[in-house]
């Protein structure tokens, strides 16, 4: 599948481009713009600076560094993070707590940049992301495979539907498999038709597909699955050049609307 012609993709508005160009962004994160296309991706989802936007599992804040400043003055950015108490005691719980703490520290260190982002903690098996019908846009980047493997995908999509306003948008970017994958698949990829079916089962309508994050060099047949590729690079160091030439994964970019 060929990537979309960049000339045919929506361009980010001036405020969004300013956030993308911000000197507060982690330099390592900026290097990945060539693979993640934040401006065109967010423009495709129809983001506006006045919206309430919930980002699901923001991790280290790659998109947070763009979204929070963009929404600071007129909108609202909400980071939805897994409730550490919902994770079994041990390394997993410690990691969940540490991830939230580090993101809070990032925001607190530069209030003039990020303002006061909100946090919501959720339980993956029974998620609630806020007051019903309160969000304009829900975003999730490269997370669906984890929910599938944990058996939580149905509950997560239902939670997205509940928190969105009628007409609200769900934007999904995910590693794209060649076809539907079985329930026990550990590759990190998900079939595009499969993902669309998940969203539609929750009540969403598919409103658009973009190839902005496509990568035809991704053969999707690696020993460590998608984690073989950058940025995880789970491979022998001798193969660095090989996988760097492929780049990050082939990704579907899907826009859904709440009816």
Locations of the language-model features?
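Conserved Class I S-adenosyl-L-methionine
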Residues: 183-209
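A short glycine-rich, Lys/Arg-flanked "PGG" loop and its adjoining helix->strand segment in the class I
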Residues: 68-69, 153-166
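A short acidic, Gly/Pro-enriched loop at the edge of an enzyme's catalytic core
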Residues: 127-138
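C-terminal lobe and adjacent flexible extensions of AdoMet/dcAdoMet transferase-like proteins
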Residues: 243-259
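Conserved class I S-adenosyl-L-methionine
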Residues: 48-59
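S-adenosyl-L-methionine
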Residues: 92-127
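A short, conserved alpha-helix within the catalytic core of class I
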Residues: 124, 146-159
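Conserved beta-strand signature within the Rossmann-like core of class I S-adenosyl-L-methionine
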Residues: 78-80, 167-176
């Amino acid at each position: 599948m060929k990537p979309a012609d960049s000339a045919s993709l929506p361009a980010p508005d001036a405020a969004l481009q300013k956030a993308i160009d911000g000197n507060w962004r982690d330099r390592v994160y900026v290097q990945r713009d060539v693979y993640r296309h934040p401006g065109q991706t967010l423009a495709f989802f129809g983001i506006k600076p006045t919206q309430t936007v919930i980002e699901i599992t923001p991790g280290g804040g790659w998109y947070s560094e763009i979204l929070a400043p963009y929404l600071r003055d007129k909108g609202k950015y909400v980071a939805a993070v897994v409730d550490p108490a919902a994770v079994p005691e041990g390394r997993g719980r410690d990691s969940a707590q540490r991830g939230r703490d580090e993101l809070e520290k990032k925001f607190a260190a530069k209030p003039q940049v990020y303002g006061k982002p909100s946090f919501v903690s959720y339980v993956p098996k029974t998620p609630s992301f806020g007051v019903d019908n309160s969000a304009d846009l829900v975003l999730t980047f490269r997370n669906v495979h984890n929910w599938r493997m944990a058996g939580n995908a149905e509950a997560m999509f239902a939670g997205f539907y509940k928190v969105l306003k009628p007409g609200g948008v769900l934007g999904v970017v995910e590693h794209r498999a060649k076809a539907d994958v079985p329930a026990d698949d550990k590759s990190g990829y998900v079939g595009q038709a499969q993902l669309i079916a998940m969203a539609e089962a929750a009540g969403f309508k598919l409103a658009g597909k973009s190839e902005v994050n496509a990568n035809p060099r991704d053969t999707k047949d690696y020993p460590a699955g998608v984690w073989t590729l950058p940025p995880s690079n789970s491979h022998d160091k001798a193969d660095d050049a090989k996988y760097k030439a492929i780049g990050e994964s082939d990704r579907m970019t899907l826009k859904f609307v709440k009816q």
